[in-house]
Amino acid sequence: MGVGTLLNGLLVSVVAALLWKYSKLSEHAALLEEELHMTRRSQELSQAHIDYHVALQALQEHGTRMVCTGKMHTDRICRFDYLCYCSEAEEFVFFHSNSSVMLPNLGSRRFQPALLDLSSVEDHNTQYFNFLELPAATLRFLPKPVFVPDVALILNRFNPDNLMHVFHDDLLPAFYTMKQFLDLDEDARLVFMEGWDEGPHFHLYRLLSDKQPLLKEQLRNFGKLMCFTKSYIGLSKMTTWYQYGFVQPQGPKANILVSGNEIRHFAKVLMEKMNVTRAEGGQEDEYIVVFSRSSTRLILNQAELVMALAQEFQMRVVTVSLEEQSFASIVQVIGAASMLVSMHGAQLITALFLPPGAVVVELFPFAVNPDQYTPYRTLAALPGMDLHYISWRNTEEENTITHPDRPWEQGGIAHLEKEEQERIVASKDVPRHLCCRNPEWLFRIYQDTFVDIPSFLEALQAGLKAKPVWKKSKLSGGLHPGRVRDARCQTSVQTSSEAKLTVSWQMPWNLKYLKVREVKYEVWIQEQGENTYMPYILPQQNYTFSDNIKPFTTYLVWVRCIFNKNLLGPFADVLMCRT
């Protein structure tokens, strides 16, 4: 072989090696450029820094991880690491690797009916959440993900056009869900997945976080595959007090877990975020607020109503309107009012900003029974809200104006059969019904009303007679007693048919630090083997029982403390007493 041939072969090898290295460098450069691009896309979402390569490697190697609280889909909230969302499929994706965690691991039970509720409205079939599953290895076939570095709270707004729903279903639950998980702080990102646009009250959602909330429609702008590095999905339902009648007619929830203390704390925080201060005035500064509506459910003689209130109570009367004023300015006015008067409607949720001791007056159109529609009555009655509620109902049919030719959603009935229209018009009382399209309910609730001033003032004065005298109470007024201490029993047999049982105990430890108006003790005595027990309420810390106490018998005895007749403490450990 000649030297030239040898050199040519060597040159070809060197060139090939250089080309291969160049192609690898180009490939690596392209990969780095793509990662840089995806990092920029991620940082379009947030100012938080993210190492794209590290995040992608974590997703590929460890997959998605999920740990949830709650036993049922109706009370479950889940935390995810690296849960992704495919905007093309409009589905969340759980990527499985050998390091993935899924607790609870429900298998197909995850679809019976869902993993969790995306909103605080319980078990509504439009609010269910679930995800698709893929092996992490399929990431190589999918578009490069955009990572969201913020901690996200992902939820559905239930009805963002309605102020009552905004507060009751969304803001309060989201606020206290964020309190439940420490990393859902003011830097967290809210992500709304129900598909609505911003709506008229979007500024209120912005108060929950320093980050702009994201809408479902906006997610596709950031890429075909978005991955949330850390997210929480679902809302706490503990702050809700009302159910809307999807399964049974609407009314207060059966098991209300929130008090006025939590509602008032939430209201205080929102007022601070809106730069609203609560004015502290004396009696000379008292005034009444009347809510004015401009399109439906009108008070047709509003000026007369305002004048009557001013004359009756010798107070200034202020009118407010959601259509004409900013929400913050309305809250500023309501926050120091003595009384809030309004036709039934979502605007009455602003009663949660009223000061303690204020009065809520709710007006109802003809044929609408106040006892059947009670979200604001229930709010006012929550322990610690300290609001007094009064309702007035129009009972005079001639004082109402109906709108049968409006669209059905505003109470129109022209689309119904003539016989059904006649039945609805003739009805004097809307029967109990389910949500949400009952035509008789809509026809009546969207009426306009001339308020009969004499009957209105009569209802107001009767209601005010029942108003308790509100005093600024100290926190200890609502605190419960602890367990009684050192409970013990002694027995003695008097005769073959008579015995005595003496029970004694020490007061709860926390009682010595509290100012309590009344302290009593409850004792339960049960003969072993029997199903019934004898209850006793006692003012002292020891007592000798002889009635119905038999010799040579074992009794089970429980003791607890009661503050102010209704603040019950826990029972101490059961005593076993043998006579």
From Swiss-Prot:
Pfam families: Glyco_transf_61 (PF04577)
PROSITE patterns per the UniProt record, alphabetical: FN3 (PS50853)
Pathway(s) annotated for this protein in UniProt: Protein modification; protein glycosylation
A GO cellular component entry from the record: endoplasmic reticulum membrane
EC number(s) per entry: 2.4.1.312
Domain Fibronectin type-III stretches: 480-579
Membrane topology: Single-pass type II membrane protein
Catalytic activity: 3-O-(alpha-D-mannosyl)-L-threonyl-[protein] + UDP-N-acetyl-alpha-D-glucosamine = 3-O-(N-acetyl-beta-D-glucosaminyl-(1->4)-alpha-D-mannosyl)-L-threonyl-[protein] + UDP + H(+)
UniProt subcellular location: Endoplasmic reticulum membrane
Highest taxon above the source species: Eukaryota
GO biological process: neuron migration; protein O-linked glycosylation; protein O-linked mannosylation
Alphabetized InterPro entries for the sequence: FN3_dom, FN3_sf, Glyco_transf_61_cat, Glycosyltransferase_61, Ig-like_fold
Role summary: O-linked mannose beta-1,4-N-acetylglucosaminyltransferase that transfers UDP-N-acetyl-D-glucosamine to the 4-position of the mannose to generate N-acetyl-D-glucosamine-beta-1,4-O-D-mannosylprotein. Involved in the biosynthesis of the phosphorylated O-mannosyl trisaccharide (N-acetylgalactosamine-beta-3-N-acetylglucosamine-beta-4-(phosphate-6-)mannose), a carbohydrate structure present in alpha-dystroglycan (DAG1), which is required for binding laminin G-like domain-containing extracellular proteins with high affinity.
Protein name, as recorded: Protein O-linked-mannose beta-1,4-N-acetylglucosaminyltransferase 2
Organism (species): Tetraodon nigroviridis
